[in-house]
UniProtKB/Swiss-Prot annotation:
It comes from Homo sapiens. It is a peripheral membrane protein. Pfam families: Methyltransf_23. Its EC number is 2.1.1.64, 2.1.1.-, 2.1.1.114. The gene is COQ3. The keyword Transcription regulation does not apply. Its cofactor is Mg(2+). This is Ubiquinone biosynthesis O-methyltransferase, mitochondrial.
Length: 369
């Protein structure tokens, strides 16, 4: 491994670097400065002169132990910036997380890779606002969503979270990418009003399901479901954190040949509208599949409408065609009162007849029969 040469200054630096990790470099230094290596010309193996062996025998043993200890530490070493991703985050794809981690500092560049999302706010913010206003009997002008509690799942840098907060809502934005949340927190700090209305957390949806069950008036998952690895679990969690009668808003990409051609081949590989690897066609979901899963979890789909993006103008507009992007709005069913059992109803009718029997002879005769 060492080609019969002395472990010189570079080797000493290597051991010194490993020193803070707990390796005993003091035991290795005598070997570096005094041990003599002789290369066997026939076998190419390493040998030590007999006179030197006795003198440095103890040093050799200590040094080998030191080196092996250091190598074991190297095997288990993890750079401090290499984030560990919990396996309990069942819907979070670690590959997707790494993709967005590399772009975390670009969220608020309106001319950068997230320009389409900035432009999408022209559609999705009114879409959310107008549908929520249908559930609010009286709203305050200028702050129409005042009093509403909204969860923005996969909030990224807060591009949609902030407009919802400006409409008066109390918004919690969650994202599994720590750098995304740092960017979002930094940006909202420039607006004291938003700083009070918006809260950001580094977590997945599954991690807050129990503590936030039936807490939110609305859940928003915009451009998120095409990145999760377990769609059914994700949507089930969305339903669980909604109040009865709460609203769920989703924008995503349909799973069609057209979406593959334009959403991946053109947008990523040709025009570079979004970075390569941002989307995986297999994760795209059709409106029919989405509606089926939502209805199985007690949500009723109210609206599905297509969205089209013009890469030349940079604007979005609504469309009847849902072959590419689309928005969906669903409402969680309200808790229904359980109907009284037949036994309970019969018992009530009997007690009523007995009470009337005291004053009505006809009823008394009826009970005898």
């Amino acid at each position: 491994m060492w080609s019969g040469r002395k472990l010189g200054s570079s080797g000493g630096w290597f051991l010194r670097v490993l020193g803070p990790g707990g390796c005993n470099t003091k035991a290795a230094r005598p070997l570096i400065s005094s041990a003599v290596y002789v290369k066997n010309q026939l076998s190419g193996t390493l040998q030590i002169k007999p006179g030197v062996f006795n003198e440095y025998r103890t040093i050799w043993f200590k040094s080998y132990r030191t080196i092996f200890s250091c190598l074991n530490r190297i095997k288990s070493f993890r750079y401090p910036w290499a984030r560990l991703y919990s396996t309990s985050q069942t819907t979070v794809d670690s590959g997707e997380v790494k993709t967005f981690l590399a772009l975390a500092h670009k969220w608020w560049d309106e001319q950068g890779v997230y320009a389409p999302l900035h432009s999408m706010n022209d559609l999705r913010v009114p879409f959310i606002r107008d549908n929520l206003l249908k559930t609010i009997p009286n709203h305050q002008p200028g702050k129409p969503l005042l009093g509403m509690k909204i969860l923005d799942v996969g909030c990224g840098g807060g591009l949609l979270t902030e407009p919802l907060g400006r409409l008066g809502a109390s918004v919690i934005g969650i994202d599994p990418v720590d750098e995304n949340i740092k960017t979002a927190q930094c940006h909202k700090s420039f607006d004291p009003v938003l700083d009070k209305r918006i809260e950001y957390r580094v977590c997945s949806l599954e991690e807050i399901v129990e503590e936030t069950a039936e807490t939110f008036d609305a859940v928003v998952a915009s451009e998120v479901v095409e990145h999760v690895i377990d769609l059914e679990t994700f949507l089930q969690c969305c339903c669980q954190v909604l109040k009865p009668g709460g609203s769920l808003f989703i924008t995503t990409i349909n799973k069609t040949q057209l979406s593959y051609a334009l959403g991946i081949v053109f947008s990523e590989q040709i025009a570079s509208i979004v970075p390569k690897g941002t989307h995986t066609w297999e994760k795209f979901v059709s409106p029919e599949t989405l509606e089926s899963i939502l209805e199985s979890n007690g949500l009723s789909v109210q609206t599905v409408v297509g969205m089209l993006y013009n890469p030349f103008s940079g604007y979005w507009h609504w469309s009847e065609n849902t072959s590419l992007n689309y928005a969906a709005y669903a409402v969680k069913s309200r808790v229904q009162e359980h109907p009284a059992s037949a036994e309970f109803v019969l018992k009530g009718e009997t007690e009523e007849l007995q009470a009337n029997a005291c004053t009505n002879p006809a009823v008394h005769e009826k009970l005898k029969k």
